[in-house]
Amino acid sequence: MFELTKRIDSNTQDAVFDTLTLPYELRIRGRLKAVTDNGHDVGLFLDRGPVLRNGDLLRASSGEVFSISAADEPVTTAYIENGLPLARLCYHLGNRHVSLAIGVDADGRHWIRFPPDHVLEELAILLGAQLTHHQAPFDPESGAYAHAGREQSHAHSHEHSHADGHTHAH
């Protein structure tokens, strides 16, 4: 088994030995056992930290370089007009603390992608989005504080309320 222990810069001159294709729920973990695209057994032994992104590179303790690929998985893609409609949909979905991927397709249509969820889908339709259910890589936004160190993290707490009248603190 190859022990993948180090994240490396994507500008490395080393050849990629193999690719590890994982869905989002596994790319957030620092410890797991998996099988690469070419059938090699690997174990991830990474410090907690950033999510593994499509194209990230990892080095095995024996020196080989492995590329990470985001697996196709069930997603809902909400297509919506740019500008205020897009901002409004991002705001309302983000207020529900759901992971979101945001992008533009080859035809210039703006989209928001999230794991299938009938409540979120109803909200997106209510706000003017057209939905597509399909298989695609899910690589959500990392969040505003994802690159901050421990000392710089979003450490203060705050409260907010929702339309149904309940509140909670963070």
UniProtKB/Swiss-Prot annotation:
Biased composition (Basic and acidic residues): 148-170
Alphabetical list of Pfam families matching this protein: UreE_C, UreE_N
Compartment annotation: Cytoplasm
Record carries keyword Isomerase: no
Molecular function as annotated in GO: nickel cation binding; unfolded protein binding
UniProt keyword Ion transport present: no
Principal localisation: cytoplasm
Any one GO biological process: protein-containing complex assembly
Span list, region Disordered: 137-170
GO CC annotation, single: cytoplasm
Reported function: Involved in urease metallocenter assembly. Binds nickel. Probably functions as a nickel donor during metallocenter assembly.
UniProt protein name: Urease accessory protein UreE
